[in-house]
């Protein structure tokens, strides 16, 4: 206690008073002392952070560390996931490989942490918590010894001063000697402690390189750990890539064309082939294809399905615009356009050539420079667009329109420039490139092409979705077959469809049209489209325009073999009504069901007006060339143009009336007028079989059979012809077994008017005949086989009446159920 008191008093004197303070350390050792504290702080914080970096439990064994290591837990999870998904899936294989790799990495991590803990963390702990504190402890002990020495010196000095003034020298001298001995002993202890402290400090300074080696060891151990980990990863990466490359199902949108074709082993990109094949089945007659925007949700869904190589054809056959939008989106999302950046300048230069032949040659040269993959796909696409342009009368997509909407998706500049420039100049140039290629597709890419190369993407359902309603079912169809097209049509309003069916059967066409419902029926349009040909055929031979050479040389072939007719033109009825002129046996008009739509269209006009001229020319003979007209025999029902004009609905202004003896003038006036019906597409569904009965008061021209004189009709289904499902008009090609029709002659006795009509209608498509029609006869014709009617027994009449009544009741009950 006395020593402690002396130390405190000496410290107070040195701090407050002016007592002398002895400094036993040199300047260098004082600097080392300051550095000790800094090194201690750094070592302590580094040790703390390094310990936090350890993922395993510090100080535990390797097995215990492995169980609690996050990488080990991850590896176990991946292996369990692989077992759940199975090795037959790509994801299962990936999980298994990654799980094994993560387990190996976990083992390397454990080894790394053990080495870091042994070579870095523990030495830093000893430095910060043992070595430096020991030096600092000696420094504190030296400070105490110095205070003891200073206190002894101060007391000795005070004793010496007081002994000089005192009279009794002996007691004072003895006390001074004792204090001097104490002072010398304290000085010796200070000297020993100072030497030991100095040695430790100099040793610390000398060992600083060893302390630095701790951190070098840390980096080396980390490098070795990462090197081993990298070796493991590099060993497993080829296996993972091999598994992925072996897996064929990969996204195609936004991927390079070459990569997609190489992975899938295809020549035509899957989205292109799938979309084209589906459009060939359900979209060729869709108005505004590629121009009408599809539903965004359906487009997104279809793109995702195409990426997975899984397409629900039945679902998307109901929306051709979504299919066309997906095709445009795929072409636009290609990293490089289908016509390539490399040939962009050459395409643009070719489009700037003014002369048509040189322009086509320049485009052909650029097309031949395309890479093989791009050339195959552009050939496939252009062939499809060329085929689509064959239906331009219905779908309104001319080569120019297709070039406008598809051109920017086939070619665009590599450097995105001014948007205004791209929308004007560049867009027009690209249209000038694509349009002639579509127009001359067979010249650019000769030969036929098979669109459905790898699989059946097409839909068995043919639906035109621009029409609000499907056509009425045929009464000859089975009820089960009749429901199938009804289920596939657009579900607008069941009530409206039912009402339309009832009005159709009861009140006829005019009542339906008076309600504002647009009825799309290919049967009526076929008869309307043939009216122009009927008018021309009824005109005098001197007023008939010559047929085009191409149409005369190559009449349209029917898809089905034509049945030979005993007589191509039926003789006109005598004024007596039931008396028949002698001639070959007549053929039933019900055979028109078995003919193609083209032949049915050519055979039906005679029912309403085709024999009008025959009635005014009694000298006409039924003998004609068998190949001149593929249509069945004309029904013997002549009607006046004036009478038909009264009954039909006037969709356009009627031209000034001319005398009855000048039907050619009416044909000339109506030739330049477009038909309003041609503005709307013709649905490809089954035409309506229901015919409209003539009113009782229907007046006929003189010399013709009146309705009252005709025998009663047994059933509409017996005497009404039903057209088969309309098919696209095939390209004109020469028939090898049929000679070309002869041009009409002036001599009326040599051939009948029907023989003049046949070559005119053979080369005309329904769209061409419709475009020149002004007055439309909306009343369906009724073909009556008089010979077979007269031969019907009463039993057959009763049977047919019962069948008709049964079918009518089935249709009424079905419409009520709807």
Swiss-Prot record:
Intracellular or extracellular location(s): Cell projection, Dendritic spine; Recycling endosome; Presynapse; Cell projection, Dendrite
GO BP of this protein: exocytosis; modification of postsynaptic structure; modulation of chemical synaptic transmission; negative regulation of filopodium assembly; negative regulation of Rac protein signal transduction; regulation of actin cytoskeleton organization; regulation of dendritic spine morphogenesis; regulation of GTPase activity
Region annotated Interaction with BST2, chain positions: 731-818
Chief place where the protein resides: other
InterPro entries: AH/BAR_dom_sf, BAR_dom, RHG17/44/SH3BP1-like, Rho_GTPase_activation_prot, RhoGAP_dom
Notes concerning its domains: Rho-GAP domain is required to promote GRIA1 exocytosis from recycling endosomes. Rho-GAP and BAR domains are necessary for the control of long-term potentiation in hippocampal neurons. In dendrites, BAR domain mediates the recruitment to patches where plasma membrane is deformed by acto-myosin mediated contractile forces.
Organism: Homo sapiens (Human)
Protein name, per record: Rho GTPase-activating protein 44
Phosphoserine modified-residue sites: 493, 809
Motif residue range(s): PDZ-binding: 815-818
One MF term in the entry's GO annotations: GTPase activator activity
Role summary: GTPase-activating protein (GAP) that stimulates the GTPase activity of Rho-type GTPases. Thereby, controls Rho-type GTPases cycling between their active GTP-bound and inactive GDP-bound states. Acts as a GAP at least for CDC42 and RAC1. In neurons, is involved in dendritic spine formation and synaptic plasticity in a specific RAC1-GAP activity. Limits the initiation of exploratory dendritic filopodia. Recruited to actin-patches that seed filopodia, binds specifically to plasma membrane sections that are deformed inward by acto-myosin mediated contractile forces.
Record field: compositional bias (Low complexity): 563-579, 614-641, 688-708
Keyword Metal-binding: no
Highest taxon in the source lineage: Eukaryota
Annotated site (Arginine finger): 291
Lineage: Eukaryota, Metazoa, Chordata, Craniata, Vertebrata
Bias kind Polar residues: ranges: 598-611, 746-757
BAR domain mapped to chain residues: 14-249
Binding partners and assembly: Interacts with BST2 (via cytoplasmic domain). Interacts (probably via PDZ-binding motif) with SHANK3 (via PDZ domain); the interaction takes place in dendritic spines and promotes GRIA1 exocytosis.
A GO CC term attached to the entry: plasma membrane
Coiled coil: none
Domain (Rho-GAP): residue spans on this chain: 255-445
Region (Disordered): 467-493, 530-772, 789-818
Keyword Phosphoprotein (UniProt): yes
Bias (Basic and acidic residues): 479-489, 794-809
């Amino acid at each position: 206690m006395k020593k402690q008191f002396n130390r405190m008093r000496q410290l107070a004197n040195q701090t407050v008073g002016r007592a002398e303070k002895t400094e036993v350390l040199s300047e260098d050792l004082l600097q080392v002392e300051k550095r000790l504290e800094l090194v201690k702080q750094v070592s302590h914080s580094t040790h703390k952070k390094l310990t936090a970096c350890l993922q395993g439990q510090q100080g535990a064994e390797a097995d215990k560390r492995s169980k609690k290591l996050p990488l080990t837990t991850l590896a176990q999870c991946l292996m369990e996931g692989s077992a759940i998904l199975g090795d037959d899936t790509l994801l299962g294989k990936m999980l298994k490989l990654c799980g094994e790799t993560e387990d190996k990495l976990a083992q390397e991590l454990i080894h790394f942490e053990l080495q870091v803990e042994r070579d870095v963390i523990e030495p830093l702990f000893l430095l910060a918590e043992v070595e430096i504190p020991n030096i600092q402890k000696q420094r504190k002990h030296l400070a105490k010894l110095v205070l003891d020495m200073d206190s002894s010196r101060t007391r000795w000095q005070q004793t010496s001063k007081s002994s000089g003034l005192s009279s009794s020298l002996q007691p004072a001298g003895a006390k001074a000697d004792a204090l001097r001995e104490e002072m010398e002993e304290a000085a010796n202890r200070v000297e020993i402690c100072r030497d030991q402290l100095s040695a430790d400090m100099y040793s610390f300074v000398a060992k600083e390189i060893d302390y630095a080696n701790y951190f070098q060891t840390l980096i080396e151990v980390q490098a070795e750990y990462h090197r081993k980990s990298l070796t493991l990863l590099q060993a497993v990466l080829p296996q993972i890539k091999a598994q992925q490359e072996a897996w064929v199902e990969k996204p195609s949108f936004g991927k390079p064309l070459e990569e997609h074709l190489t992975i899938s082993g295809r020549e035509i990109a899957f989205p292109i082939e799938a979309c084209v094949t589906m459009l060939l089945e359900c979209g060729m007659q869709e108005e505004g294809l590629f121009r009408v925007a599809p539903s965004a949700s359906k487009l997104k869904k279809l793109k995702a399905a195409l990426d997975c190589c899984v397409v629900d054809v039945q679902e998307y056959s109901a929306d051709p615009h979504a299919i066309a939008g997906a095709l445009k989106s795929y072409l636009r999302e290609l990293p490089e356009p289908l016509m390539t950046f490399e040939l962009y300048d050459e395409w643009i230069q070719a489009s700037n050539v003014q002369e048509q032949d040189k322009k086509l040659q320049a485009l052909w040269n650029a097309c031949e420079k395309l890479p093989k993959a791009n050339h195959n796909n552009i050939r496939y696409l252009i062939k499809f667009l060329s085929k689509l342009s064959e239906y331009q009368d219905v779908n309104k997509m001319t080569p120019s329109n297709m070039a406008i909407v598809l051109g920017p998706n086939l070619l665009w500049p590599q450097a995105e420039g001014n948007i205004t420039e791209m929308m004007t100049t560049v867009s027009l140039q690209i249209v000038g490139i694509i349009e002639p290629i579509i127009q001359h597709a067979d010249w650019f890419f000769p030969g036929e092409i098979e669109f459905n190369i790898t699989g059946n993407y097409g839909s068995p359902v043919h639906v035109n979705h621009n029409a609000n309603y499907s056509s009425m079912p045929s009464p000859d169809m089975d009820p089960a077959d009749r429901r199938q097209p009804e289920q596939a049509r657009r579900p607008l309003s069941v009530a409206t469809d039912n009402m339309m069916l009832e009005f159709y059967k009861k009140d006829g066409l005019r009542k339906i049209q008076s309600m504002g419902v647009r009825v799309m029926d290919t049967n009526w349009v076929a008869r309307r489209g043939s009216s122009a040909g009927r008018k021309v055929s009824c005109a005098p031979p001197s007023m008939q325009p010559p047929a085009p050479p191409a149409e005369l040389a190559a009449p349209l072939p029917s898809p089905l073999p034509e049945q030979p007719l005993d007589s191509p033109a039926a003789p006109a009825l005598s004024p007596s009504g039931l008396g028949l002129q002698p001639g070959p046996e007549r053929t039933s008009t019900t055979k028109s069901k078995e003919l193609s739509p083209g032949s049915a269209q050519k055979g039906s006009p005679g029912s309403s007006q085709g024999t009008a001229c025959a009635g005014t020319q009694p000298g006409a003979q039924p003998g004609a060339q068998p190949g001149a007209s593929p249509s069945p025999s004309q029904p013997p029902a002549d009607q006046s143009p004036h009478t038909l004009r009264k009954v039909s609905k006037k969709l356009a202004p009627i031209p000034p009336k001319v005398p009855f003896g000048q039907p050619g003038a009416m044909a000339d006036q109506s030739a330049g007028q477009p038909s309003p019906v041609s503005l709307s597409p013709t649905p490809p569904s089954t035409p309506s079989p229901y015919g409209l009965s003539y009113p009782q008061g229907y007046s006929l021209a003189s010399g013709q059979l009146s309705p009252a004189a005709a025998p009663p009709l047994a059933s509409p289904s017996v005497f009404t012809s039903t057209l088969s499902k309309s098919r696209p008009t095939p390209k004109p090609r020469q028939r090898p077994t049929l000679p070309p029709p002869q041009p009409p002659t002036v001599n009326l006795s040599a051939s009948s008017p029907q023989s003049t009509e046949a070559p005119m209608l053979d080369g005309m498509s329904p769209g061409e005949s419709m475009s020149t029609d002004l007055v439309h006869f909306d009343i369906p014709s009724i073909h009556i086989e008089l010979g077979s009617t007269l031969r019907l027994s009463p039993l057959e009449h009763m049977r047919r009446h019962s069948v008709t009544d049964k079918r009518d009741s089935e249709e009424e009950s079905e419409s009520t159920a709807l």
